Every structure is written in structure tokens, then in C-alpha cells.
Swiss-Prot record:
GO biological process, one term: cell wall biogenesis
Residues in the signal sequence: 1-23
Origin superkingdom: Eukaryota
Keyword DNA-binding: no
Entry protein name: Probable xyloglucan endotransglucosylase/hydrolase protein 30
CDD domains: GH16_XET (cd02176)
Post-translational modification (record): Contains at least one intrachain disulfide bond essential for its enzymatic activity.
Gene: XTH30
Length: 343
């Protein structure tokens, strides 16, 4: 069976497993005015007439971004996002939570970062987390997507509670971090705001900086809509902490806070098919895995000691055979299937 056929089967299985178990059917969506504020590049931030969506532009002069009007002590942060098309090398679109403006040396952060690519190559993305300024202990995972994120809107979400963090793409949980005592202050614990930005990261974003942003294709436009923010809104510097127990109870009662058996199977398949780097398997960087790592033998066997995918063997031979037989470069492991039967 070809790599392309396998990917299409993966997508169909996702549809069948998750169609009736959506974690996002009853989200309370907000307008820009009632939940968000411009962060920078105001002229490159374009709000829709109904105030329910916003376009972030990057040109040769500046990028742009927005921030939530409030900070939250734990929360659920979600938006439908459509990424720029065509040549996007050097471009980064970020959807993340942070408190770096308040706690500069001890900040917490939860990241979803989309990394642009040259024309004909797919967007990649990565997730990461920091607690209490632990930026020297990066916890990156990097992935491909099973769809073209520049063709349609897809929902990207971050859940953060005192006990767990879940990153979602549409109805698929792609990463779960369970807090344990050994993580200590590395687990994010201080109030955070939501951020979304588009910016030029030509020095590292695409092939380690080999390919730069090309402003012949500007403006690069990222679109956001259907914002959802739930959590305990707090003042991060107040002397008496607020009681957020009711808010946490609400978060943990929602469907997006738990992963059912079908979703867990989808997460396992996603990670087996589309994750191409994990810090948990990077034994050169971390000879002993960090305490939250759950080592999955089926995953570990696919990675080198650098935490990157092994290339070679049967997969490499299959890719070469497919190229010879079908002469379709899009079936290489680095490409994304273009399938309209998505969730």
C-alpha cells in the first residue's frame, strides 16, 4: 500500500471515529471587541465588519498581532485559523498563551507555532511549554498536518488546567501533558493571556534559516475567527489570589478536558504518522527523559537519538518506488495529503 493511500485511510478513520464525539459542539464564541485587543502592527490588523473575525498581515515593514483583554488562571483558548498560501518560507504564525509581559524572568508559556515553507511544501507546526522561565528546557514537538491549512479554516485549541494540558487540532487531541510533582515549577502555573501573531522568523523558521521570507508574495495573511476563551479572569499581580476553583471545575467538566477512547486512538495514530520530532526521544539533549514524558515503544522505535525521525529502510524504499511508479512528488513523507473529507 502506498504512503498516500495509507494517509487517506488515516483521514477516513479519523472521520468515522470522531464525527459523533466532537469536543467543540457547544463553544461560546466571542467577538473581537469583547475579548481581544490589538497588540502591534495596528495597520496590519483588519477586523471584519461584524467584528467576529480578524486578519493578521505581514509585509516588509511589520507583522501584527492581538492579545486577549484579560489574563486567565487556567483556561481554554481556541480559534478557527486559516494560514497564508503559496510561498511562506520564513513566516511564523503563532497562537499561544504567555505572561512574559508581567513576569519577564519567570514567565510561563504554551505555544502552537506554524512554520511556513517554500512553494509546494507544506506548513509544519510545533507545540511547546515553559513554566517559571524554564526556557533552557525546551519541550518541543514538531508535526505535519493531514490537510492543507491554507485552504480552509480549522480549529486549534489549548486547554490548561492545574492537572493537565491538551493541544487540539479540530477534534483530534495531538498532545497531552499530565502534571506530576517532579515537574515542579516547570509546569505553567501563573495567569496567562492569549496571543496571536504573524512575524518574520527568516533566521530559523524554514530549514534552519536556509529559506527566507520573500516579500514578492506579501502581504502574508493569517485569518482568525470563532474565538473561544473560558477560564478564571484574574489580575496577575494582586496580593490576594482569587479563588478559581469553580472555574477549574467548569473547565474540567467540558468535553475538551477529557479524551475518550476514540480520540485517544486518533491521537496515537496522529503521533505515529505526523510527529517528526519529540524532545522526549532526544537522548542527546536529555539523556534522561523529562519527568512528564511518557515513552511509547511504538513511537520511540521511529526516532533517532536526536529525537528526529529515522529515514531509511522500508519507508525510504517505498517513497522511491512510489516516485518511480506514479511520478507524484506529493506522496513523499514530507508532503501533506490534500483531502476534502476532513472533520
Amino acid at each position: 500500500m502506498s504512503k498516500s493511500s495509507y494517509n487517506h485511510i488515516f483521514i477516513l478513520i479519523l472521520c468515522l471515529c470522531l464525527r459523533s464525539s466532537s469536543a467543540f459542539t457547544n463553544l461560546n464564541t466571542l467577538s473581537f471587541e469583547e475579548s481581544l485587543s490589538p497588540l502591534f502592527g495596528d495597520a496590519n490588523l483588519v477586523r471584519s465588519p461584524d467584528d467576529l473575525s480578524v486578519r493578521l498581515l505581514l509585509d516588509r515593514y511589520t507583522g501584527s498581532g492581538f492579545i486577549s483583554s484579560n489574563m486567565y488562571q487556567h483556561g481554554f483558548y481556541s480559534s478557527m485559523i486559516k494560514l497564508p498560501a503559496d510561498y511562506t518560507a520564513g513566516v511564523v504564525v503563532a497562537f499561544y498563551t504567555s505572561n512574559g509581559d508581567v513576569f519577564e524572568k519567570t514567565h510561563d508559556e504554551l505555544d502552537i507555532e506554524f512554520l511556513g515553507n517554500i512553494k509546494g511544501k507544506p506548513w509544519r507546526f510545533q507545540t511547546n511549554l515553559y513554566g517559571n522561565g524554564s526556557t533552557h528546557r525546551g519541550r518541543e514537538e514538531r508535526y505535519r498536518l493531514w490537510f492543507d491549512p491554507s485552504k480552509e479554516f480549522h480549529r486549534y485549541s489549548i486547554l490548561w488546567t492545574p492537572h493537565k494540558i491538551i493541544f487540539w487540532v479540530d477534534d483530534v487531541p495531538i498532545r497531552e501533558v499530565i502534571r506530576n510533582d517532579a515537574m515542579g515549577a516547570d509546569y505553567p502555573a501563573k495567569p496567562m493571556a492569549l496571543y496571536a501573531t504573524i512575524w518574520d522568523a527568516s533566521d530559523w523558521a524554514t530549514s534552519g534559516g536556509k529559506y527566507k521570507a520573500n516579500y514578492k508574495f506579501a502581504p502574508f495573511v493569517a485569518e482568525f475567527k470563532s474565538f473561544s476563551l473560558d477560564g478564571c479572569s484574574v489580575d496577575p499581580i494582586q496580593e490576594v489570589p482569587m479563588d478559581c476553583s469553580d472555574s477549574v471545575d467548569f473547565l474540567e467538566s467540558q468535553d475538551y478536558s477529557s479524551i475518550n477512547s476514540h480520540q485517544r486512538a486518533a491521537m496515537r495514530r496522529f503521533r505515529q504518522r505526523f510527529m517528526y520530532y519529540s524532545y522526549c526521544y532526544d537522548t542527546l539533549r536529555y539523556p534522561e527523559p523529562l519527568p512528564e514524558c511518557v515513552i511509547v515503544p511504538a513511537e520511540k522505535d521511529r526516532f533517532k537519538e536526536t529525537g528526529r525521525l529515522k529515514f531509511g529502510g522500508t519507508e525510504a524504499r517505498e517513497r522511491r518506488r512510489n516516485r518511480r511508479q506514479q511520478r507524484r512528488p506529493e506522496i513523499e513523507i514530507e508532503s501533506d495529503p490534500d483531502d476534502r473529507k476532513l472533520l
